[in-house]
Amino acid sequence: MWHKIEISENNIEASTDKAVLIKMKHNSNFDGFVFWHPKKLVRAEGKMFTFSFNDEFKFNLKKYGNGKWNSRDVVREENIGANGMLAEWAL
C-alpha cells in the first residue's frame, strides 16, 4: 500500500536531479535528522509538498554535526520503516 505525507517547504533541505533531502519535523523523536528521498516520489502541491512511499520502504535517517569542523560528518544514524515514518509525522 502507498502512503503520502504532506510537508512544508521548510522541510526541504536540498534537491538534486535525482533526490530531495528532507528534514524531519521538530516535534518528532528524530528532530535534527535528514534523509534522501527519490525526487520522482516528491510532489509540489500548492505551497506544500508531499512525499510518497510504500510499505516496504526503508528510511536511512542521518544526523550531521552542528560545529564548524564536523558539519559534514554523520554523528548518528537510524533506520526506520514505513510505519515508523508514518508514526513520526503523525505526532
Where are these regions (language model features)?
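Conserved active-site motif detector
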Residues: 1-91
